[in-house]
Amino acid sequence: PAVRVVNPHSGEEIARLDGIARAHDVPLLIDGAYGMPFPNIVFTDAVPTWNENIVLGLSLSKLGLPSARTGIIVASEEVIGALGSANAIMSLATGTFGQLMAEPLIRSGELLSLSDDIIRPFYLEKSRRTLEWIDELFADDVEYSVHESEGAFFLWMWFKNLPITTYELYRRLKERNVIVVPGTYFFFGMKEAWSHSDECIRLNYAMPDKEVRRGLEIIAEEAKKAVSEGAVRSSR
């Protein structure tokens, strides 16, 4: 479970999860939309893992082809047969645009070089710049941490001293045309309340640099404003 910012699992972790799945006679499902072997938007030394008990989901969306709506499943022949039959029933006529584009790239190996040499470096640099801007823009009186950036298009920020919830911060940011995802949506199924779930946001840095920086400026302004409002209330 790592949907918040994409936390690439090591081979050891996958092996452990696979062992647990096998012990309960269920397949291990891996969502590899950002991972290996493509689009490889992974900034760690993770390695691709697959065996007959793993159902690996991949996508063309993060290669810049979201409208192709093409998902790729790597699984045993038995699982692929069942999925193919289900898909034939659920989708009367599935599009083939994505398949026609992807097949020659896969056969030639260009898909891997495109991922390794263009896509991964591009987003790694965008992540680095975004982290630098956060350090530059956020005031010292706004206490925050940023989860280690390990891949994908997102950063996870934790505000430690905001007097408002990050849902309220989201509402204020929306009024200024900045959209973030409040952290509360990522803590579903918990039996007990946890304040941390109301202290975090997820940011997307995939947009043009100018827009990303301006969005961060507005987030920093609203966070500082909220902290200042809280300080005023506390002094009364």
Segments from the language model and where they lie:
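Active-site phosphate-binding strand-loop segment of PLP-dependent enzymes
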Residues: 1-39
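Active-site PLP attachment segment
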Residues: 37, 45-85, 93-98, 212-215
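Structural signature of PLP-dependent enzymes
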Residues: 84-90, 108-132, 162
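Conserved glycine-rich beta-strand-loop-beta hairpin in the small C-terminal domain of fold type I
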Residues: 117-131, 143-159, 196
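Conserved C-terminal alpha-helix-loop-beta "cap" of PLP-dependent enzymes
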Residues: 154-201, 214
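PLP-dependent enzyme catalytic core of the Aspartate aminotransferase-like
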Residues: 175-176, 190-236
